[in-house]
Amino acid sequence: MIKVFIAGATGWAGSAIAKGVYNEKGMQLAGGLSRFNKQENLAEILDFGNDEIPLFGTIEEALEQVDFDVLVEFTKPDIAKKNILSALNKGKKVVVGTSGLTNEDYTEIEKAANDNNT
């Protein structure tokens, strides 16, 4: 079972990805990140029924409190870079859907991924 955490989980793209992950066999939606709905139940916000899926306001909180394998990143570039680097530095795999990152950002992200064997 692949445990997936989504940054930007209540946005238009993030919520669509969350629904896909939630319904996919072999995947578990471990939690989400939202600057607007922190401390709420993602399952309730996205109408998944009675499940409890934690929602956090910062990646640091999530990394301390939730076990996940993969971060799917769909926020804004300035937030995304911090989220990506934090996850990579904790040994998490990362999928980036955020646009607007610079070549310098990607160079730094690639170095962090290589340094952490992710």
Task: State what each model feature region is.
Residues 1-5:
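Extreme N-terminal starter segment of soluble prokaryotic enzymes
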Residues 7-10, 14-19:
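N-terminal Rossmann NAD(P)H-binding glycine-rich loop of SDR-like oxidoreductase domains
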Residues 23-48:
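NAD(P)-binding Rossmann-fold cofactor-contacting core
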Residues 51-65:
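Short acidic low-complexity segments
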Residues 63-65, 70, 74, 78-96:
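Rossmann-fold NAD(P) dinucleotide-binding segment
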Residues 85, 89, 98-118:
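Rossmann-fold NAD(P)-binding glycine/threonine-rich loop
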